[in-house]
Amino acid sequence: DLPSNDGSRNQIVENAKERILKSRPPLLIEKKNIDLISIGNIEDDFYLVKEADWVVEAVVERIDIKHNIYEKIEKVRKEDSIISSNTSTIPLKVLSEKMSDRMKKNFCITHFFNPVRYMGLLEIVTEPVNDKEKIGILKSFCDEKLGKGVIICNDTPGFLGNRVGVYAIQVAMTEAFKMGLTIEEADAVF
């Protein structure tokens, strides 16, 4: 995260880490797993990216900010590390348009559904330039170690999950109107 302007430079993420422990429903399967989370900020600790085998970008959905982060990642990352975005809205082609070919081959979208602990679906969005072996390793890791149901998706608007979800909502609304249901009745049925 960004460094805090007052108090500890990691105050923002320290507070976020505390909120993880207090969240209901719980975000961690076991509270002791909180010790597996290392905190830091983007100014003082960015060099640590070089130690990661997989870097997941999850900043605000603004392409200028994402491109800035990718530029910084590319300068410090391991040559063979996998880089992904957790976006649910921005096309892969747009995210990767300013990347070197070297980084593009190891860049994809890993769209985790929220809340991540409880939602089993993970979409991995790829493009033809991706290193197929790396994508296979990522898919296996997410399936076997994270327990996700992984689907490989094309770079299309809404990917797969959101396209199906929006369609289901449209069908439910259309049927509710046809049946003359109230909002409460429609919510109970659909």
Predicted regions and their residues:
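Alpha-helical scaffold elements that line and support the substrate/ligand-binding pocket
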Residues: 167-173
